[in-house]
Every structure is written in C-alpha cells, then in structure tokens.
A protein has these predicted regions:
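Extreme N-terminal starter segment of soluble prokaryotic enzymes
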Residues: 2-8
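Residues at the starts of beta-strands that form the adenosine-phosphate
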Residues: 5, 49, 137, 161-164
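Short glycine-enriched, charge-decorated loop/helix-capping segments at active-site entrances
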Residues: 21-29, 66-71
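Active-site alpha/beta core segments
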Residues: 34-137
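Histidine-anchored nucleotide/phosphate-binding helix
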Residues: 36-42, 147-158
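Short acidic-hydrophobic, aromatic-tinged amphipathic segments that line or gate anion-handling sites
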Residues: 112, 190-201
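Short amphipathic alpha-helix with an adjacent loop that forms part of the alpha/beta core around
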Residues: 123-134, 196-208
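A short glycine-rich beta-strand->turn/loop micro-motif centered on a GG-aromatic cluster
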Residues: 139-142, 161-175
Length: 208
C-alpha cells in the first residue's frame, strides 16, 4: 500500500543529463544513479508515489538559446534512465487541455513533462500537488541543483509544502551555484536528508 504522507520527487533523471556522452551531461551525475535506484525501488514496491519531471523539448524550443539542445522528443536522450523508472508510469503532457483520469494516483510514478526549467510551468503540476494535500512531505532529488531541482523544491515550499532534499542523490553543474541554491532552499525551510534517512522515513511513516 502506498504511503501518501511522503512523496518522492525526482527531477530530470534523463539520459542526456545523467549519462556520460549525453547532450547536456552533468559531470558526476552517474555517481548518484545507485541512490536514485534505491529511492525509486520503493515506488516499484508500491511503498509510495514517485513524481518525476522530464524535459520533453521540440527541436526549436526557446530554451536552446541558453542551453545546448537536449532531451529532444523522440531521441534516446529524453528517456528517463531505467533506474529512475517504476513499472506503472503515467506521463502528463504540458498541455492544459489534457484531462487526467480519476485513476492517475493508482500509478507508481507520475511524469510531468516540461519545456522550461520550472516544472510548475506545466499547469497540471499545481493540480497534482493540490490533490495530494497540504500535509504531504516531499523528498526531492535529481539534477540539476541550481536550476530544475531548485525551482521544483522552491515551488513546493512556496505552496506551503514540507520539503527535504536528498543530499546524496543530487548533482550540480557548477559547485558554487549549487551551494548557493541549497543555502537559499535551507533559508526557506528545506531540510536535508541522506538516501538512507529518506528510506527510513518512509518505513517509519508506514509503520505508524
């Protein structure tokens, strides 16, 4: 049975970011894959819900004026790494006209597609968070700390949600920028936990 008191929030664990040779490879990202797998395994086991963001770009997206082309729809690089995927996955496009089924939360993993850095630009993100309720705690991990991780965590905090960053399951492009982002999140109320602590939190809440 899923624990709805805690939700894991995985940020952009995609081939182009996570794997050497990816179009926008984050140096060192492959080192956090084992911890991502450990966290996602809990969703595979039906222990809790996993929400993921995923870049799904078109070839001419405006973001490519700032960053090299990456995660283009239909290319291998847009795929979430196998270690970041559960078995029952439901993808939600960045399209406000798309209707979500009542059974959306019956899945192990919900993937929110985006074409910008901020997952809350997908209009369905707000609705998913609202439907999960204000008492849900979010454990955030993935890449990149100073961009998409920061915006996802801050977006949740701004909406009154409790957020913890899984500190050994994140990676940054530039260390100084990543540290600045984490300091800001800490000042806003984010906590920091290890993968071991995150897994123990789920087990502890489930036992209550």
């Amino acid at each position: 049975m899923q624990n709805r008191k805690i939700v894991f929030w995985e940020v952009d664990a995609q081939e182009d970011f996570m794997v050497p040779g990816g179009k926008l490879y984050v140096p060192g990202a492959e080192k956090i894959i084992p911890n991502i797998k450990r966290l996602v395994d809990m969703a595979r086991e039906g222990r809790l819900l996993l929400i993921s963001s995923a870049c799904r770009h078109l070839a001419d997206d405006p973001e490519f004026q700032t960053f090299p082309p990456h995660c283009v729809r239909g290319t291998p690089g847009e795929r979430i790494i196998p270690q970041g995927l559960a078995q029952k996955v439901y993808s939600i496009p960045n399209d406000g006209t798309a209707k979500l089924p009542d059974s959306v939360f019956d899945n192990q993993q919900i993937v929110l597609e985006k074409q910008t850095l901020d997952v809350f630009a997908n209009p369905h993100t707000e609705g998913i968070v609202n439907r999960l309720g204000k008492d849900t705690e979010y454990l955030v991990f993935g890449v990149v700390v100073e961009h998409c991780v920061h915006l996802a965590a801050k977006g949740l905090i701004d909406r009154g949600r409790k957020v913890s960053i899984v500190k050994d399951a994140i990676e940054t492009l530039r260390g100084v920028d990543g540290r600045r982002s984490l300091d800001e999140l800490k000042s806003l109320g984010a906590a920091f936990v290890s993968t071991d602590e995150a897994i123990a939190m789920v087990a502890g809440k489930a036992a209550r």
